[in-house]
A protein has these predicted regions:
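Extended, charge-rich alpha-helical scaffolding segments
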Residues: 2-75
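Short terminal interaction segments
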Residues: 73, 77-136
Length: 136
């Protein structure tokens, strides 16, 4: 079981690393405003996520839905522990990159909306409601 689990974890490291590379490519596309390449990144990211999910199912079959920390402590294998920490570190990097990309996209959308409001302002008269807030 130890060898099989180690093999599956190595596959998982490779899959998560490929997802990280795709997210970095998405980041590059966001920075240079390459919309068509950004659209192509979406499909690649989905494929990488499917691959990770498949490998995760394989790992859960091997571990019988037990927690990985419990298994790593029980088996006390250096390679297994090293791979476990590599996966955790890669996952943190993926989360950071994903959050950065989402923030940049939201920032770009906010900027675009402000520019549109400057170019085409709302022509309605502003009225106040009972709470003193401006209705939109």
């Amino acid at each position: 079981m130890k060898q099989k689990l180690n093999t599956v974890m190595l596959q998982e490291i490779e899959a998560v690393h490929s997802l990280l590379l795709e997210l970095e490519e998405q980041h590059r596309c966001i920075i240079v405003n390459d919309i068509f390449a950004l659209e192509a990144c979406v499909g690649k990211i989905k494929d990488a996520n499917k691959n990770i999910a498949y490998i995760e199912v394989e790992r859960r079959k091997l571990t019988e839905n037990r927690a990985m920390t419990e298994i790593v402590e029980e088996l006390r294998d250096e390679k297994l522990e090293s791979n476990y920490h590599k996966i955790k570190q890669l996952l943190q990097e993926v989360i950071l990159q994903k959050d950065t990309n989402e923030l940049l996209i939201k920032q770009g959308l906010s900027f675009t909306n402000r520019i549109l409001n400057v170019l085409n302002p709302v022509r309605e008269t502003k009225t106040y409601n009972a709470y003193g807030k401006v209705k939109k």
